[in-house]
A protein has these predicted regions:
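Membrane-proximal, proline-rich intrinsically disordered regions
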Residues: 24-73, 87, 231, 396-437
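Hydrophobic-face positions in mid-chain alpha helices that act as interaction patches
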Residues: 45, 222-317, 322-373, 377-378, ...
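Long, intrinsically disordered, low-complexity segments
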Residues: 24, 203, 285, 300, ...
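Aromatic-residue-lined binding/catalytic grooves and analogous aromatic/hydrophobic interfacial grooves
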Residues: 24-25, 173-186, 203, 207-259, ...
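Conserved, well-structured interaction surfaces
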Residues: 48, 75, 79-146, 152-187, ...
């Protein structure tokens, strides 16, 4: 894997020398006198850059493709019409792969080392939690990927691919567990604050987030008991959500930026429209099934981009609980939070759930109903693609051919520059990752 230009996107002013354009392979060189080595960026400057790279990626191309394959949105013009018909090539995935490795994983190696050396426990906890989230987001669409040998630069420019099931996923759990331990210790000399763009250094909020990510983790691997237990330790309300609110005015949310520049390329999908219409979900349709341009009422320039949310956790509880009353309460909580997410209030929510087709009452809710409401509630959230792969809900009809994509291609650059990359496979888009049912 040949990593290229490291780009820093910090909310702080960072003075970067000409080394901005050097290869990240040099980042790990033993030659401290290397004139092309990057400047020594402090943790407080590196952290927001890393976090924003994850948030931008998740709300950008990860959502564009994953939610298109999940049939929440559809490509209707230019190259996106071809992508919608599953005519997509490995080169299209160079950017998201590069973004995660160069701007997140490689940078985190240095941040973790500095935090460890300095005894900055809470910075280290945030770094590990962020890495775990980014790893899961990446492996869930790519499957096996370089991890244990990634970021070694000149030492190994052809890192081996680690197994998702036996290496990557266990590493995710370990990182999350370690982060909880660190958050329960004293901060150390440096205390995270406004440089943590997600929680402003609030370690109690981070603990809730880690438990919430663990709930998703266990759900993916089919461990419902632990998914339920972790979900109950996670977010208690929407105010706990793990995410970032874009300020707008040029620093815009990813979907707004896409729609502003690529107006007419993507639209609301008929599959989701049909499901919502069948449930008389007119109020939410009025917020979502709108022309995808800069005036979209939900996909605004100042949209909050949640990495994981209270509504997702409530649907996890509804799916995994065996207690009928608990399942029903969580189901309704998830729907209500989904209404609030798009700016709707109690009156609209009450009218909607008054329908027996939506809420059949305690003891009568089916898994299909839970997953359909989660599918609606996680609009443009990549997790909707994971849910479909886990459960097969909703039933999706292929746009082209005989199958719906279940993952992404490996990027073209991996085939060109990493001798350890898997052999090319034209059918890879339709093959399952390890946890896919």
């Amino acid at each position: 894997m040949k990593l290229k230009n490291i780009k820093f996107k910090n909310i702080l002013v960072i003075f970067i020398a000409t080394a901005l354009f050097t290869s990240c392979e040099d980042f790990f060189s033993d030659d401290n006198a290397d004139p092309n080595a990057p400047v020594d960026v402090p943790i407080s400057a590196a952290l927001p850059s890393i976090q924003l790279s994850v948030i931008d990626s998740k709300g950008g191309v990860y959502s564009n493709f994953s939610n298109m394959f999940a049939q929440q949105v559809e490509g209707v013009a230019r190259q996106w019409e071809s992508f919608n018909n599953y005519d997509v090539q490995p080169v299209r995935f160079n950017q998201p792969w590069q973004q995660m490795y160069e701007n997140v994983f490689v940078e985190l190696i240095t941040v973790k080392q500095k935090a460890t050396d300095g005894g900055h426990n809470h910075y280290l906890g945030i770094a590990k939690a962020t890495e775990a989230y980014a790893l899961m987001m990446t492996t869930d669409v790519f499957g096996d990927m370089p991890f244990t040998e990634a970021g070694l630069g000149d030492v190994n420019s052809n890192p081996a691919y680690d197994s998702q099931a036996t290496v990557i996923y266990p590493a995710i759990r370990a990182l999350l567990t370690e982060s909880l331990t660190l958050f329960n210790q004293a901060s150390g000399p440096l205390v995270p604050g406004s440089d943590d763009v997600i929680y402003n250094g609030d370690v109690d909020a981070w603990k809730l987030a880690v438990h919430s990510i663990l709930a998703r983790y266990y759900l993916h691997i089919g461990d419902n008991a632990n998914a339920l237990a972790e979900a109950k330790l996670g977010f208690a309300s929407r105010s706990d959500n793990m995410g970032y609110t874009y300020p707008g005015a040029g620093n815009d949310a990813p979907w707004y930026g896409f729609n502003d520049v690529r107006f007419g390329d993507i639209a609301f999908h008929p599959t989701l429209r049909g499901i919502m219409t069948g449930l008389n979900d007119t109020d939410r349709l009025g917020k979502l099934d709108v022309t995808f341009d800069a005036n979209h009422p939900y996909l605004t320039s100042t949209q909050r981009e949640d990495l994981i949310s209270y509504r997702e956790l409530q649907f996890i509880i509804a799916e995994t609980s065996t207690n009928a009353a608990e399942k029903h309460t969580a189901f309704l909580n998830g729907i209500k939070a989904s209404f609030e997410e798009v700016g709707l209030g109690t009156a609209e929510y009450n009218a909607y759930v008054a329908q027996p087709s939506v809420d059949p009452g305690v003891g009568n809710i089916t898994n299909n109903q839970i997953m359909i409401q989660k599918y609606i509630g996680l609009f443009v959230q990549p997790e909707a693609f994971s849910d479909w792969r886990r459960t097969g809900i909703p039933a999706l009809t292929p746009v082209a051919g005989s199958a719906v994509p279940r993952r992404w291609f490996y990027p073209e650059n991996e085939y060109l520059f990493n001798e350890s990359a898997p052999a090319r496979n034209s059918n890879l888009l339709f093959e399952k990752v390890s946890w896919d049912n």
